[in-house]
């Protein structure tokens, strides 16, 4: 019985080794790491460039300050009662819809950039359309029909 379990474990380890050795798993790992780094770049772009411009265009609106408080502020709270970050740190239950707007903009930017990347990759690997083949002449059936008609005409 112990010998069978050992054999199963060794078999599973062999399968796992084959699975890991395939390029797909390594490609996925690289993609996850690059995706994490790319996400940080997009977050920085959104928070440091895009949202301040949107705030400026909307009259100085700071979207991080848009929230709804759901519970009371603790009596010993000494921070800014209009600061989402400070209230959140104090444990006040809130809905931060301004932060949600920022994250939604992040998502749209990431989705659009991924769309552009996929479109460019697809264009690179796109096979050029082959020109339609020139007609190669009559088919076998058409030739036989011509021969038949010629024989009928002769008599």
UniProtKB/Swiss-Prot annotation:
Query: Could you tell me the keywords of this UniProt record?
Result: Cell inner membrane, Cell membrane, Ion channel, Ion transport, Membrane, Transmembrane, Transmembrane helix, Transport
Q: Name one GO molecular function term.
A: mechanosensitive monoatomic ion channel activity
Positions of transmembrane segments: 25-45, 98-118
* SUPFAM superfamilies documented for this protein: Gated mechanosensitive channel
Q: How does it sit in the membrane?
A: Multi-pass membrane protein
The record's section on NCBIfam families has: mscL, PRK00567.1-4, PRK13952.1
Q: Which family does it belong to?
A: Belongs to the MscL family.
Q: Where in the cell is it found?
A: Cell inner membrane
This protein's GO cellular component annotations are: plasma membrane
Relate the protein's function as given in its record. Answer: Channel that opens in response to stretch forces in the membrane lipid bilayer. May participate in the regulation of osmotic pressure changes within the cell.
> What binding partners and quaternary form does the record give?
Homopentamer.
The protein here is known as: Large-conductance mechanosensitive channel
Superkingdom assignment: Bacteria
Q: InterPro entries, alphabetically?
A: Mechanosensitive_channel_CS, MS_channel, MSC/AndL, MscL_channel
Alphabetical list of HAMAP family matching this protein: MscL
